[in-house]
Every structure is written in structure tokens, then in C-alpha cells.
């Protein structure tokens, strides 16, 4: 165990189990918000990470998705082992969903602290615009990254640990 960036306690964790546990409550949240959560979590994925921080990333991404995904849509969460190159292990967490309106020119700004693609949404959906900036900060503190891409009406967030 070692003390990582930003005070995280980094240990070897069963990432598959941590992601599954953090995602489980969002199945009912998604249903209550008129959506459905579908998960594809590879078994046996491990990472050198802070378990509480990983759970926070999953919770922030799924809270965001359940708030902003199109009514009746499926939110897809997946976790798989990946490679950072030179044999160094990594994991990739992906959350993807349909949205009513994709903020085309604003995608890169979604990770900016306090940024909101549509300021009128705060009164409808809540939130303060900090969640995705926290996701990126946690990913980077773990030596990884967080990115977003959009195609058509589909938005996909990818976090690498």
C-alpha cells in the first residue's frame, strides 16, 4: 500500500468487483429516471488504485448519465483490461448513452470545473458542474486519463486507470 497523489491510498484492488459494487445501486436509479442500465464488466480486472476513488468515478459518471440520457434509453457501462503500452497493465471504464442534444462544440469543456453545457439544466436536473472535473482529476491522479467523444446523439466517457 502506498500514498498516491492527492492523498489517495493506492493498493492492488479487484477493480471488477469495485466497479460492479458501485454501479449496482444505479440500476434502480436509472429505472426511476426512465432509463435502463446495462453492464458488461470483465471479471478478474485488477488495478493499483484507491477503491473509494474508483467508486466515486463510477458514481459520478452514472449519476450524470442517469440525469442526462434520453428518456427510455439504455446506459451502457463496461470495464475491460487494457494496455498502456510496454506491457504495463491498465483498465478502461466506459459509460455511453444517448442524449437529446449533443453539445458538439462543448465536448472538450465538459471536464472543466463548473462548466454546464446548458445552464438552464441546473434547475431541472440539479448538479453543480463539478462531477466530471472530479472524474478527470481522479483518473489523472491514478496515472490515467478521462476523455469524452460524441457521435450522432451518442456520448461516451472513457476513463483509463
Which residues make up each language-model segment?
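Conserved catalytic submotifs in the C-terminal HATPase_c
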Residues: 9-14, 31, 36-46, 82
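Conserved glycine-rich
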Residues: 35, 143-144
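A residue-level detector for a conserved hydrophobic packing site
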Residues: 54-55
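Short helix-loop "hinge" at the ATP-lid/N-box region of the Bergerat-fold HATPase_c
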Residues: 65-66
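Short beta-strand/loop element within the Bergerat-fold HATPase_c
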Residues: 72-89
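Short conserved segment of the HATPase_c
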Residues: 102-116
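Short alpha-helical Gxxx[C/S/T] motif in the catalytic ATP-binding
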Residues: 131, 135
Amino acid at each position: 500500500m502506498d500514498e498516491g497523489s492527492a492523498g489517495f491510498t493506492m493498493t492492488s484492488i479487484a477493480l471488477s468487483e469495485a466497479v460492479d459494487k458501485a454501479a449496482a445501486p444505479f440500476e434502480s436509479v436509472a429505472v426511476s429516471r426512465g432509463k435502463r442500465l446495462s453492464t458488461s464488466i470483465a471479471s478478474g480486472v485488477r488495478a493499483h488504485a484507491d477503491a473509494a476513488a474508483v467508486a466515486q468515478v463510477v458514481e459520478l459518471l452514472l449519476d450524470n448519465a442517469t440525469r442526462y440520457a434520453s428518456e427510455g434509453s439504455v446506459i451502457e457501462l463496461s470495464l475491460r483490461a487494457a494496455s498502456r503500452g510496454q506491457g504495463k497493465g491498465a483498465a478502461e471504464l466506459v459509460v455511453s448513452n444517448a442524449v437529446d442534444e449533443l453539445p458538439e462544440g462543448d465536448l472538450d469543456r465538459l471536464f472543466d470545473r463548473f462548466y454546464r453545457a446548458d445552464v438552464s439544466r441546473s434547475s431541472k436536473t440539479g448538479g453543480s458542474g463539478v462531477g466530471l472535473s472530479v472524474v478527470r482529476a481522479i483518473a489523472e491522479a491514478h496515472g490515467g486519463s478521462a476523455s469524452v467523444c460524441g457521435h450522432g446523439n451518442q456520448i461516451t466517457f472513457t476513463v483509463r486507470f
